[in-house]
């Protein structure tokens, strides 16, 4: 009985540790996987997305220019 209780306690502690670790990861925003780029006629710096036909959603991009085969996306 003591071994079974100890095993349950170990499993419970491990579950708490892994759950807390996942919550820590969820707090951080995902990194953009883009390089800096510039388009002629547009002020500021854009994000160069390699081998994409369109700008990805969820980053607030409002304009873009093509640098074949890549795309340079501009926020706001």
Curated annotation (Swiss-Prot):
Compartment(s): Secreted; Nematocyst
Give GO BP annotations, semicolon-separated: regulation of blood pressure
- Signal peptide per UniProt: 1-19
Query: InterPro entries this protein is in?
Result: BDS_K_chnl_tox (IPR012414), Myo_ane_neurotoxin_sf (IPR023355)
Q: Which UniProt keywords apply?
A: Cleavage on pair of basic residues, Disulfide bond, Hypotensive agent, Ion channel impairing toxin, Nematocyst, Neurotoxin, Potassium channel impairing toxin, Secreted, Signal, Toxin, Voltage-gated potassium channel impairing toxin
* Record carries keyword rRNA-binding: no
Disulphide bond pairs: 37-72, 39-65, 55-73
Q: Which tissues and organs express this gene's product? A: Highly expressed in the ectodermal tissue from the distal and proximal tentacles, body wall, and oral disk.
What would be one Pfam family of this protein?
Defensin_4
Report if keyword Secreted is assigned: yes
Proregion residues excised on maturation: 20-31
One molecular function GO term is: toxin activity
Domain of life assignment? Eukaryota
SUPFAM superfamilies, per the entry: Defensin-like
**GO cellular-component term (any):** nematocyst
Q: What else is known?
A: Is the most represented component of the BDS family in A.viridis. This protein sequence is identical to BDS-1 from A.sulcata (AC P11494).
Homology family: Belongs to the sea anemone type 3 (BDS) potassium channel toxin family.
Function field:
Acts as a gating modifier on both Kv and Nav ion channels, and also acts on blood pressure. Voltage-dependently inhibits voltage-gated potassium channels Kv3 (Kv3.1/KCNC1, Kv3.2/KCNC2 and Kv3.4/KCNC4) and slows inactivation of the voltage-gated sodium channel Nav1.7/SCN9A. Inhibits all Kv3.1, Kv3.2 and Kv3.4 by about 50% when tested at a voltage of +40 mV (45%, 48% and 56%, respectively). May act by binding residues in voltage-sensing domains S3b and S4 of Kv3.
Q: What is this protein called?
A: Kappa-actitoxin-Avd4a
